[in-house]
Every structure is written in C-alpha cells, then in structure tokens.
Amino acid sequence: MTDPRSALPNVFTNISAREIDFVTRFTDNWEALREVLGIMRPIRKAPGTKLVSYTASVQLEDGDVPEGAIIPYSKATVVEAAKGDLTIQKYAKAVTIEDVNKYGAAIAVQKTDDAFLNELQSTVLDSFYDFLTDDTSAITATYSTFQMGVAMAIGKVRDKFKRMRKNASSVVVFVNTLDAYEYLGAAELTVQTLFGIDYVKNFMGADTMILSSEIEAGTIIAVPTDNIVLYYIDPGDSEFAQLGLNYAVEGETNLIGFHAEGNYNTAVGASFALMGMSLWAEYADAIAIITVDDTP
C-alpha cells in the first residue's frame, strides 16, 4: 500500500533543495518588499562595519562677488548623529521526529519553515522601526488628526530634503495598524498584503504607507525612500566557511544563509539561519516623527 504522505506537496527529500528553496524565497520576498518601499539595491558590507547617520547643513554665502575679490566659503556642516554596528544574527529551530510522525513532513517541516522565514523577515523591519523612533535628531511635531499628521509628516521630510538640495523622489510612511484602519474605515482604499506586511499605495501624498502594530498608536513616521539604505553581510563569506560553517545562499545578493541537518542525539531536524541585515537612514534629520493628539 502506498504511503499517503508521499503524495503530499512540498516534501523535500533532499536537504539541499530545501535549503535553496528557503534562501530563494527569503531573497525574493525582500526584493519584492524593496520594490514596494522604493529603496535602492542592498549594499554589501564587511562584518563589523559601523553604520553612521548624519545631519547636514550648508550656510550659503552671497554669490555676488566683485571682480577679483575673494570668494567667501559657504559653511558646510556634517555631524554624526547616530551609530550602530552591522552584526551577524544567528537563529536555529528544531522539528522533532514525533511531530513529523504525527503531522507528516509537509506540515511539520514546511509549515515551520514558512513561519521561521516570516519571523526572520519581520525582525529586520522591527529593528528599523526601533531605529527610527529612537532617533533624537528627527523632526518632531504634534497634530490633532491622523490626516493632518500624515500630510505634515510627508511635507516636513520633503521640505528638509529640498533645503538639503536633495531630491525626495518618494516618501514611505509608517503608521499604527489600528490607527490606519480607524481612518480608512470611511475611505475607499485597498490595503494590500505582501508576506504579512500590510500597505497602501499612493495615499495622501505617501507613495507607500506601511501598517504595523510595532508602531505606537498615535505615531506617524515619514522617511524619503532616498534616505533608506539596506546594508547586509554576506552569509556565504569564505571566512565563515573556514570555521566549517557552510550555509546555502542563492542569487546575486546573499541576504541570508540557511543550513538544515538531522541531529541523531535528539532525533530532531535542526535548521540554522545566519543573516546580517540592517535598514538604515543616512540622514537622521530627514525623518519625521509626528504625534497625533486630539486633546483640546
């Protein structure tokens, strides 16, 4: 009699195929999210790289200079505003032989791989939210309505980029999920979902509005997409391999490494993920953090 489990889809009998599937899906998801956010391609950095955000300003002198006179220097000021380390994050999960026996490999392995992948994606965005809200150089203000808060958040970062003589080609706005739905309840707008991330396109001047429960209620954050950079460490770095750690990577941009193996001592299927990714804002003072408070 044929084992009915053999007919189930997505059962990887080859560990290498499962590893490649995992890293390919992760990379494809991030590529799609990058396009939604409108940010440029990821930039590879060496392990231990220091990430720095700046504030920048120029005090322009008069350009009407008499013939033969010394041209006065315009004062340019660049100040380091925030620092961070681009570090390696290490994750592991295990599926027991009992779970495979109870549910079958298609559920016990594949479903937990899916959940593992989603959590790894979310941790990068969550860290970015923390970075944005902890920024003491950000533009801050308070408005009485959600609509005004969104509009002014966008306006303030566009104005900042204009005064920096930079082009804010598009702006992404981050808002609390319930705040957005409360406002959107009366509006005919389509909320789209990409790998568990809810967003609205072309809303009130924002090219993309990200809805997240990680953003505090009453808080609106706006960032020009030209101010967002995704840095990463290549998990396939040859120096890691010298430790005997060989992670599967896939594609031109190796954002994550994945390795799966069986552990006979505990009778589990162990999976290991290695990544070093950080979304970063280059100019700390080109971020707007708006508080919505309708208290009279």
Where are these regions (language model features)?
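Sequence/fold signature of self-assembling virion shell proteins
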Residues: T2-P9, I43-K50, L189-P296
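Extended, solvent-exposed, turn-rich assembly/linker loops in the middle of proteins
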Residues: T136-D207
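Generic hydrophobic, helix-prone segments enriched in Leu/Val/Ile
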Residues: A7, F22-N29, I43, P47, ...
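Assembly/oligomerization interface modules of large self-assembling protein complexes
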Residues: R18-K90
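Alpha-helical scaffold segments that mediate packing/assembly in large oligomeric complexes
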Residues: A92, T96-K166, I289-P296
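Short, intrinsically disordered N-terminal pre-domain segments
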Residues: M1-T24, D28, D294-P296
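Residues at beta-strand starts and edge strands
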Residues: Q89-Y91, S169, N265-A267
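Helix N-cap / beta->alpha transition motif
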Residues: Q89-D99, V173-D179, G205, L211-S213, ...
